[in-house]
Amino acid sequence: MYVDPRLVILSRGPGLYSTMRLTEESQRYGFITRVIDPMSISTAVDDDGAKIYHQGWPIQTDAVIPRIGFSITRPGSGIVRQFERMGAIVHNTADAILLSRDKIAATQVMAECGLPVPKTISVASMDDCMQALRTIGSYPLVIKASEGTQGASVFLLDDEARAISLLAQMFQRGMRPLIQEYIEESHGRDIRVIVVRGRVVASMERKARGTEFRSNFHLGGSVEAIKLTPDQESVAIRAANELGLDVAGVDMLDSASGPLVLEANSSPGLEGIERATGINVAARIVSSLRARVRERIEEGDMPPNQDVPHGSSIESHLDSNEASG
């Protein structure tokens, strides 16, 4: 007999707004929920398959919500992949997280699928910078790091000298810069859309504070609910789908030619958009995951919950491997 499904929320900040909201709603939807720091997890692979340990004991779960911060993208994604191998239902997969965090790779995928994106150039060395700046063609322009979140390492440059100086500093720090066209008509404004399994559940416009051109909520920008046009909604859904994201915060700019996709965030913050829209976004995410668990149970692909057997600690796993060797 199947009892309440188990959920692991991978987060380094159990007290963060988004993590607390997801925990609250998951418990309301009947999940037995644990919040675990992904960097406190150990993994093992042997003849019996993939295993995950926390504080010396194995983790058994039916579903996972990864809230993987930028600074632990690669090791965190490795943990997510291990859960996938163990058969857990994961919102979002490791591959989708890695792709969405790589701005140039994500832009390439979206452009190849016909999605509208700003003109963007990735430069590998200072030798390529002058040609890239000429290709963009006009100032001001945007320079950003190829990886980053919440508006970090994003700059607006209004002349060539400052652009060259910034690019040189980024290379010295081991960063790979992206040079991007500036969309004047959307200065200091962008649109954040939350997409959950192919459906828009909430949307807002973000406006920068004062002279700041970055509109991120965590940088002090203001937010308000907006109604998307059919074109904006279609573009947001397609962007999430093409990047393989079950849950995405899609950022778009309004240009004279229509919406342009900037990026899609695999761990979108919930505070700004829940406050702006009054929509229970956390519940929409958890409800979607609960439906996936229900589908698997009905298909007979999910075994009944079982208690962790005595003696299955990581120490016993290592002892059994030594004995078999």
List PLM regions with ranges.
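Structural motif
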Residues: 10-14, 67-70
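A long amphipathic alpha-helix within ATP-dependent nucleotide-binding catalytic cores
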Residues: 173, 212-261, 283-284, 288-302, ...
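Phosphate-binding site of ATP-dependent enzymes
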Residues: 152-243
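Protein kinase-like catalytic core scaffold
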Residues: 141, 201-202, 248, 260-262
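Active-site nucleotide/adenylate-binding loops and adjacent lid/helix of ATP-dependent enzymes
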Residues: 2-12, 19-24, 55-59, 81-87, ...
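N-terminal glycine-rich "phosphate-gripper" loop used for MgATP/nucleotide binding
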Residues: 39-84, 95-100
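Glycine-rich phosphate/pyrophosphate-binding beta-alpha loops
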Residues: 70, 265-277
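Short, charged N-terminal beta->alpha structural module
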Residues: 12-38
